[in-house]
Amino acid sequence: MGKKKIDINTREDLFLSYYKEIEKNKFDLLKICSDKNFSKSNFLKAVHCLFSLSYFCKIKDENEEEEGKEEEINDYKVKKSTTGNYYRNSEGKLFKKSNEKDQIDDVSIFYKRLPTIQDFKDTYDKYENCLNSVYYIIRKIKLLHLEYFWEILASCYGTISFIKFFNIFSNEIFSPSENGDSVFIMVGKFFRRKVRAETHYDLIFLKIILANASIPMILKLGVKDIGRFTEKEDIIVSYYRNFSIIHSLRFDNVKEFALVYKTLKNNYPSKKKKKITLFEENGKINVKTSKKDLMLFEFVCKFDCVKIFKKYFLPKPQIINNNDNNEMLECISSGSYSGFDEKSKRKIRIFFSICCRQISPKILKCIVDYVKDDIGFLDLQNRQDIYIGDSAPEKVLFLNCFFGNHKEQRVIDFFNLLTSKSIIICNTIKEKPELYDYRYITLSTVDSTFYFSDSHKGADFGVYTDEINVIINNDDIDYDYIGDDDNDEEIEETKDYGSSSSDIDDFYNVFEPKASMIPNILDSCSLEILKAYIQNITGNGLFKISPSLFLAHDVTRLVRNPKPKTETVVKILEFINTISRLSELSTNGVPFTFLTNRFEIVTSIIMSLHDERSISNSVEPVQWLRALAPFVSNDEMKLIIYKVRTLYNYEPHSNGEIKYTELVRLFDVQYLLTKGKFSLSQFNGFETSIFLNPKLLDGTINSNILNSMIIKDKEKLDLKELFFKEKPLSEAELKEKFEIATKNEKELLDQLKKENDAEKLKKKNKLKKQKNQQQQQQAKQQAQQQKQQHQQNIQQNYENQHIEDQRKFNQQTKGRPISPSSIQNQNLNPTLLQNQNQTSNPTPNLESTKKATPTTTTTTTTNSNTSAIINEIKNQDLNQQQNITENINEIYDVSIGKFKFNKKESNILGRGSNGTLVFKGIWNNRIPVAIKQMQKMFNPLISKEIEILIGLTNKNLNLVGYIDQEEDENCVYLGLTLCDGSLQSLYDQSKLNEFINQNNNQNNNNNNNRVLDLIIGMINGVIFLHDQNIVHNDLNPRNILVKDNRLIISDLGLSKMNVSSTYNFSTNAIPTGQDGYHPVEVLLEKRKTKSVDVFSLGCLIYFIMTNGAHPFGDKFSRLRYITKSKYNLSQLSNLNLVATHLIELMISYDESKRPTLSSVLKHPLFWDSLKKIKFLESSLRLLGDHDFKKFNINKILISCNSNSSSSNSICNSSNSSSSSSSSISSSSCKISSSSCYCVPLPWNQSLDYQLVDSLSNQIEKKVASYKFDQLHDLIRFIRNTLQHYNQIYRDLKQILPNSDILESLKSQQSALNYFESKFPTLIIFLFNHFSAIPEIKNSIHFSNDTCSIF
């Protein structure tokens, strides 16, 4: 909007136009004010409307006052003259022309750096029209009282125009208006309502206010809509007249606070302070005091003004010897160092009082962080023997808290906050008096008082206990200047405004301590508050509680309080009795905390402490009643005894007897009510005598009463034993008992040593006897062998002699034949030779026949001798067998049925939970077995386990075998296959690598085949279990046993049946799930499926192939990394990427993504050479199939290449994260090189150039063309090489007879190994992508039997 020229010829038309313009401008102004999307441009329009309105009002008023001054009215009706630089007005007068700046817009004054009207006049004194506009605005400034206009100004106060407006018209704005208020009072309402953040213009505005306005005006600023106060706070605020500072406190504006506080401080100088007194009159709270100083500290805490508090209230530490570090360290170690002086320490304690009174967690946290190294911090490491209650520890904050209408959780969180920051509250007695001299006890000086009230809904302390997220910026605030005014003065900062000791001390003196801490905590009847307080003063259990902490009269207030429930009081008293061991301060174990006339509490305590479960460890009822007798009336005692009788007669025991019935009968009502029959010391009254001295209760019973009761009691109970315990021993008696105990201990040690020596000697003799028996047995065997050899020699000689005799006989008989029967009937024994030696030249006549009779007798005698020798040998065998049996009985001294074993520690193979043990033993006196002993009581599913073992035995060679079972009264004994050890034992003995590589030469292929055979056997065993619907659920190196160079699975399906026993060959049984071989669903106790075993097998495969490593790190961090799916396969990925790929699938976090075991066996890791070749051929056919042209393998590789960290390789980034680190770090989620399978490009650079040239230029006299940047051509190159390796070998040998490539072309297997070494990730890359696409996986190219890989 620019200036409008009005062409009016008559006076009447002129005035009519004036009024129309005025109304039009008013309408525009109202329209702009109602616009919600108010902007800077709208603000300028509004100001222009105002100036136009003022201008027309000026014209209107002047014409009404002086009708004859038309020359002033007709300034806008100028007709320019054509002559030179002059023009004539309507009356013909000649005026000099103004230049271009003379026509300046009224609003332009707000764009220039002209802070005052005088500056403006000095700049534009040559331009009459512009100056007149400004003067008319000043004269008509009363229009600024329009509220809707100031709503606009307050909304956009941060623009430079608004600040300039105040600078120019400040005098008129702050001058009183017709109603007595200045325009500023009206503006302040909107200003304080809109302003929140502390900006440069906000501070300039305050400077204008503080420089021009009077204090009464300031006090009326920003009263409404700032904050709600309680009735008491309203009175204090009103009295001290500090409305003006509430805004900066409300929004924690530091510099704004400094400006306002300095002005108010200067206007209200400090005077001597007096105590504030609040009294109630006619239902209203009033204040009576003569103090006039400001009290800001409560409101600093009320609004959590952390930045203001830290900058202006916290004292500055005074460091001693800041330049000499060594001397300062000596001061610290000697305890003489102090970061604060005594005045500062007291001030800090007072700040504790301020912030806790208003429940200000942020301010409290600020103080705690600021002073924790200098005050209130206890060195817990060096003071572990401190008793809170003895001499006060160093650097402990002495506090007394008063809880009014407490909010339980806030009080608890307050104590927890101090505890988390190592601030120990000490509410102790400075000088420890005697216990019974309670009247002279003086408590420590109260340094702070805490008051918690529900009336103020401040922030909770709980959010600041563990992690305090309060940002305190103590630096000077750097605000960017929006405008271009370089002449603004810097705001003067005033520091340490609130550090005046008089102000703070006066606030502290306002409220006197109401009570000590323990009574008020007990009055709250909150067990949680009490626990939080005890946790604080004990430093989380590092300190012991002094018995003097809980005074008897404080506890008496608790049990006398009629408000809390009986159950609550009972729980609190039990807690006190537990932590402070109050029984040490009483006689015969009777805690004095229960001396009360509230018998319903007494009986409740007795019921809770003397139930059937703890009756044997509790104080006997007689002691409770005896302690209560002096302090209760007769009627109360009758009721107590009645309730005690009811308690112990309520439920009979299983055998029909009632425990303590006869004991309670002793306490007849008349007997207990006769107090004079007890020789107890006299007390001075209930209040002073409640602090009992243990010696005061030592008394005797009248002998007549005792005799009469013994006669009356038929069972003749020994009352002395019931009423009295053994008195404390004297020092001499204690010393004597100690010497006797030492002597007995020495004798016992000597006896144990003798027994050990005797055991060693017995064992030595036994070994010596066994050695002698072995030597004797060897001698007998040698003698028997010699005898057998001798018999054979004799037999041979006899046969030779018999043939010679027969030949001679035939010669004598002239060739007559000899019948075979005659030869068969002859006795072939050694004695015949002797007889024939005695008879020379035998003849077949009668005489010789007669001499044959004695020969037969000799033969019979010889047969008898041979039988005797045989019997002797049999007897020796029997004796030897008997000796072996005796030796077995000596070695295995425990016999259960057919099992024999020894329970010595050296004979234990393993331990399990619930008392399960595995022993080495024998079955049927000859077969070595592993004997598993299981407790019947703790293993209810033993029969189920045996049933499964029997059903699975001999059906799979990779499962542990069942042999037999026996049982006795308590245990069941299973005979299982005895193995050589477990994978874990091999690893512990550093023999795992030796076991895997045994029976192999240096060929890596043989070693790999050995490893794969072991893994396949283990997987087949688990597959067999799954086929039987059994989930093992506990596969780990301790349950994988070694037998005959095979891996055998033990603990078959016990976790599936919830049997907690284990079969481990380890001396340390680890609970299920704690060794890191269980997936996350087992750790979270979710449903268990077969995928649990897949996860465990993946970890075991990694264990075997890396010589004992684990995918999830060491045993201390495995569980945490399993739940976060953080694994590290780097130890294997450098050796075998194919195995890494398989393991990564098997240990997937999501159980649905883990492969089945049948799919695991189809993984390329277990492929032979034929299957790999078939796979490459099928892949080549697939990539050339027209139906799968849309599957561009090279496009996939290029996409992977863009995600790879290297620009010269193509990667399969199935998982985006990869790392070469060998350890699992918190920053990396998954570490595995298998997450990126790379094929170098161009691929011909990875091969020997002789091979590439040979295959490219001459294959069966045909030239083959290959694209070295295409993976399809690489597969074709490999296929052609494998098919024509013989021809390529012959061609290269003729050209390069000494080339190294010839070794790789001797066979198809060697050629395949060559390509696998050059491209180790090729097959797994193709397998991974093909298996993810159903159309390819189910295509005809992979459906035949030779290549059914998916």
UniProtKB/Swiss-Prot annotation:
Q: Which GO terms describe its biological process?
A: IRE1-mediated unfolded protein response; mRNA processing
Q: Where is the KEN domain?
A: 1169-1346
Q: Where is the composition biased (Basic residues)?
A: 761-771
- CC terms in the record's Gene Ontology section: IRE1-TRAF2-ASK1 complex
Principal localisation: membrane
Specify the signal sequence span: none
Keywords (alphabetical) are:
ATP-binding, Coiled coil, Glycoprotein, Kinase, Membrane, Nucleotide-binding, Serine/threonine-protein kinase, Transferase, Transmembrane, Transmembrane helix
Where along the chain is composition biased (Low complexity)? 772-795, 824-864
Q: What family is this protein classified in? A: Belongs to the protein kinase superfamily. Ser/Thr protein kinase family.
Q: What is this protein's name?
A: Probable serine/threonine-protein kinase irlE
